[in-house]
């Protein structure tokens, strides 16, 4: 698991020391993954700094840079977008579901450009650790709404995963969704 927090501080390589830190972090992660002969890598992308606004051009450039650098590895990527790494999603997520939908659309444009290296997108940006639980947007209706927005924004070649069998059943029950694009991730002990 490799985590990155998108910011508005980094601009272009060589002009900001933060890019050097990011590049060093990515290089170390790619090298670690390669030395372990990993074929899959989970990247967590934290959007917390943008809970109250759209992602900026700098943040989107940062996401693109992260994905481009990971293309140097032999790993396929599992991506999880989140607003919380500390189990406090209700205090760190956007106040309005439309902001999450906007973030989904913004990120999907870049993900589609890197679809050949992406195995799947895990979750729908909400919940503690991005795991779709303990969110203010946890109702079945809201989860289907968010899933529909993300699925409609992603290229058909990018799979999506939900957290539990119940979430999978709910999404499949929405008659406009194609089950060929879905996987479900087994629950963790935190789901109890």
Where in the sequence are the language-model features?
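Boundary/entry segment of secreted carbohydrate-active catalytic domains
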Residues: 1-32
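Active-site groove signature of glycoside hydrolases
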Residues: 78-87, 111-137
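Conserved small/polar residues in nucleotide/adenosyl-binding loops
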Residues: 184-191
């Amino acid at each position: 698991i490799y985590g990155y927090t998108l910011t508005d501080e980094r601009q272009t390589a060589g002009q900001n020391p933060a890019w050097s830190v990011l590049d060093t972090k990515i290089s170390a992660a790619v090298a670690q993954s390669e030395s372990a002969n990993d074929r899959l890598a989970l990247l967590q992308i934290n959007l917390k700094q943008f809970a109250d606004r759209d992602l900026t051009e700098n943040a989107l450039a940062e996401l693109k840079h992260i994905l481009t650098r990971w293309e140097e590895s032999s790993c396929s990527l599992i991506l999880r977008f989140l607003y919380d790494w500390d189990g406090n999603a209700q205090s760190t997520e956007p106040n309005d579901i439309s902001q999450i939908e906007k973030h989904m659309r913004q990120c999907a444009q870049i993900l589609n450009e890197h679809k050949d290296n992406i195995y799947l997108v895990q979750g729908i940006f909400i919940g503690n650790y991005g795991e779709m639980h303990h969110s203010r947007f946890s109702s079945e209706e809201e989860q289907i709404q968010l899933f529909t927005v993300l699925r409609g924004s992603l290229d058909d070649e990018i799979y999506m995963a939900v957290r539990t069998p119940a979430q999978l059943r709910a999404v499949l029950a929405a008659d406009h969704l194609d089950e060929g694009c879905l996987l479900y991730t087994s629950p963790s002990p935190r789901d109890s």
